[in-house]
């Protein structure tokens, strides 16, 4: 299922984002051996002979159903296209209290060959640390624009807790 920025189902019809069919049986699996807990590991790859590919990039949710068409689980994934450049710096926080516990991200969105319509409203930024969505930083508006470039040079809004990944930056 194709989704919008906030992971709600988009208005696109299936044939607008997918080449092929979306309802297929997963037939590739391996059973566990020499384990205390028995399990099966299922695999599916895209594109394949039934689902030939995707027409648009964006957020997707794959939903796995059992034989009774009940949801077993679902997973989010993102299909990326490199349409803009995003130079980024990881810096020390400006607040001394956060100096040894957080990292600050400064970046800007530099559209290469595409025209952005109302970019302050339409460009959606999500900052992920190690692909962990529950700590994602979202809904950041640019601090300022220069030409077509959108600049994000905040002191607090783009900070992550460093945790075990803390790096000391010495300039």
Give short role names for the model-derived ranges.
Residues 73-77:
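Edge beta-strands of extracellular beta-sandwich domains
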Residues 79-102:
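Low-complexity, Pro/Ser/Thr- and charge-rich linker/hinge segments at domain boundaries
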Residues 5-7, 50-52, 65-72, 132-133:
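Short acidic/polar inter-strand loop motif in beta-rich domains
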């Amino acid at each position: 299922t194709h989704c919008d920025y906030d992971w709600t189902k988009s208005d696109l019809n299936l044939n607008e984002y997918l080449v092929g069919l979306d309802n297929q049986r997963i037939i590739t699996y391996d059973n566990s051996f020499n384990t205390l807990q028995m399990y099966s590991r299922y695999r599916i790859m895209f594109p394949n002979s039934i689902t030939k590919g995707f027409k648009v990039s964006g957020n997707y949710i794959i939903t796995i159903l059992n034989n009774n068409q009940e949801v077993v689980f679902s997973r989010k994934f993102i299909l990326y296209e490199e349409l803009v450049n995003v130079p980024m710096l990881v810096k020390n926080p400006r607040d001394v209290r956060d100096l040894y516990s957080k990292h600050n991200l400064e970046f800007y969105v530099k559209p290469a060959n595409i025209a952005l319509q109302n970019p302050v409203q339409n460009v959606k930024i999500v900052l992920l640390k190690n692909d962990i969505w529950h700590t994602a930083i979202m809904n950041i508006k640019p601090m300022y624009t220069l030409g077509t470039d959108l600049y994000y040079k905040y002191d607090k809004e783009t900070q992550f807790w460093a945790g075990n990944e803390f790096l000391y930056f010495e300039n």
